[in-house]
Amino acid sequence: ARRQRQMCIRDRYFKQQFSQVDVPCVLVTDRADELGFDNLSSVSTDDTAASEVAMDYLFDHGHRNIALIGGDPDASSPSEHRYQGCCKSYEKHGMEFQENYFAKARYSFESAYHAMNELLCRRIPITAVFAMGDVMAVGAMRAIFDAGLRVPDDISIVGFDGTQLADYYNPKIVTIRQKYEEIAQRSVEILLQMIELKKSAVHELVPFALKNTESVRALDSV
């Protein structure tokens, strides 16, 4: 209930500010379909579905004690949707996500590093971590290495974004790949249609894909 109430405050603040805007706009990498503005379109990844796929991948590899590092669900819409995806995957596999497996972090190396250390200090059994961004995944991996542990031998990691960083880190990071070029192209096309053709707002979800590389280990129970 607390989270839902804070979401309403966040959305109400955005609505109050955007209600003063009277020109066509496109919200990029975030959803605007529930905001109800005729002049506000959106193009984004389905963050909830993508996070659910990432978590399902870990469950399919035998992991059950999966931690989450990410932004504050009460302050960020993408973070809230990715948190929901995590919870949905847990429920699908007959489990309930426990809050002590969640560590909040900003989308930075340093913040995720500290968040991973916080999880390790809680001394809870963790075999895998889903990080809401590739930058977070790298920060978490550095904390794991500094604690004398290994990825994926001791703890598996899945990231989100599909940046080049995930391909050039060692080990390469399993990640959700967002199609940024398509998101950008569609955003511009929709904006021009709204301006030149006076078209009403549309809300599109661009397909995503899970990129399977090196940072996840299948447990023996699989």
Placement of each model-derived feature along the sequence:
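Single conserved hydrophobic/aromatic residue that forms the stacking wall/gate
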Residues: 1-9
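Bacterial carbohydrate/catabolite-sensing allosteric modules
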Residues: 9, 15, 19-222
